[in-house]
A protein has these predicted regions:
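A general, composition-driven signal for non-globular sequence regions
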Residues: 1-2, 23, 155
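Generic macromolecular interface patches on structured domains
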Residues: 11, 19-20, 93, 338
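Short, conserved micro-motifs composed of acidic
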Residues: 32-347
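Cleavable N-terminal signal peptides
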Residues: 18-19, 30
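N-terminal secretory signal peptides and thylakoid transit peptides that target proteins
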Residues: 1-17
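C-terminal segment of N-terminal export signals and the immediately downstream linker at the start
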Residues: 24-34
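Short alpha-helical segments used as structural interaction elements across diverse proteins
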Residues: 3-5, 26, 234
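Low-complexity intrinsically disordered segments
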Residues: 21-24, 244
Length: 347
């Protein structure tokens, strides 16, 4: 079993990233009369006693995929982490409904999961393709890589394979957090975090890369150079949504085993640059894991996992590759946008 910790793989790159100057425009200052931002917890189920990590939500909001740590007690987990799914089986009421509306979590089959760590799922809007990060070994794939499983005509998930082409997976380097990267006026794309050298002979750095499919073929990934994003050290995921005349970027920052929190920025379509001020999520707690969100395909909701109700606990990526007990939370994207606009004095 491959049980090596994320800290062992990512720690050196995180240290290198820390050398990048920290942004000086981060703000969490209060504004009188400004909108608040209070996470909403999903019912129990889909939450349960075994925890959920790094969820993704289907386009219709009725299916949630997430990872689960083995050490939290669910004996169905065969690797350090496996991917699970829960369904909203009664859909007549207001979302997310009550506990009676959701099915108990089920482990995805061995065509998806392995005896290595499998996590960071992202489901495509059509619900037929699941991308995720895995520690399993394969030719041309680094210590961690991006894998994909396609739903078969019978509704079952096919055998997962490494994502081919695009320089996404590179045999000696770490790749993780494969997420949508759709910007106004630009072709649909994906982004990921790559820990690799910027040029031949240079040290590894933690950077954002982008790629897109053309006629079903992934194009060569390019480092996404942006002054603001490059100034944020220890970033481990970048999530993007456009709603209410604003493109919001949510940066997950993670010093593995130490903290895992959220920062907000915005995109300027005229300059094609990301802008500040960088606004800290008001519910961040540097002793509690809470980051790595996904947005519903229509931009209606953000979903993520956090240990807010359990108090200080293990932060994911520690020396044992484990994590704390995390619950599923969500927020309407409109509230995120309103909060950021108020704090950033935009609009």
């Amino acid at each position: 079993m491959n049980s090596l910790s994320r800290r062992r793989f990512f720690g050196a790159a995180a240290a290198a990233g820390a050398a990048v100057s920290s942004p000086t425009i981060l703000t969490n200052r209060a504004h009188a009369g400004a909108p608040s931002l209070v996470p909403r917890k999903l019912p129990f189920p889909p939450n349960d006693n075994f925890g959920s990590y790094e969820p993704t939500i289907s386009a219709d909001g009725n299916t949630i995929y997430f990872a689960r740590f083995a050490h939290n007690g669910d004996t169905r987990v065969k690797g350090p982490t496996d991917i699970f799914v829960t369904h909203r089986i009664r859909q007549s009421g207001e979302w997310p409904g009550t506990a009676e509306d959701w099915s108990p979590a089920e482990r995805l089959p061995n065509t998806v999961n392995s005896d290595s760590a499998d996590q960071e799922p992202w489901i495509t809007p059509d619900g037929n393709t699941l991308y995720f990060m895995s520690f399993r070994k394969a030719p041309g794939v680094g210590p961690t890589g991006i894998w994909v499983s396609h739903k078969q005509p019978n509704g079952e998930w096919g055998q997962a394979q490494p994502v081919p082409g695009g320089n996404i997976n590179v045999s000696e380097y770490i790749t993780h957090c494969f997420m949508p990267f759709d910007l106004p006026g630009q072709p649909s794309a994906m982004c990921f975090i790559g820990i690799r050298p910027r040029e031949q002979g240079a040290p590894n750095t933690t950077d954002l890369y982008t790629t897109r499919q053309v006629d079903g073929v992934w194009q060569p990934a390019q480092r996404y150079a942006d002054r603001l994003l490059d100034s944020i050290a220890l970033k481990c995921r970048f999530s993007v949504v456009t709603r209410d005349d604003l493109t919001l970027g949510v940066v997950s920052v993670h010093d593995f085993g130490k903290f895992h929190t959220l920062l907000f920025v915005h995109y300027d379509p005229k300059s094609k640059e990301w802008k500040g001020p960088i606004v800290e999520a008001p519910f961040n707690d540097w002793n509690i894991d809470g980051a790595c969100p996904n947005f519903q395909a229509n931009g209606q909701r953000m979903i993520w996992s956090a240990g807010y109700d359990h108090g200080p606990d293990l932060i994911s990526g520690g020396k044992d590759g484990a994590g704390g007990l995390y619950d599923l939370f969500w927020l309407p994207t409109s509230e995120l946008i309103a909060y950021y606009k108020a704090r950033a004095s935009i609009g």
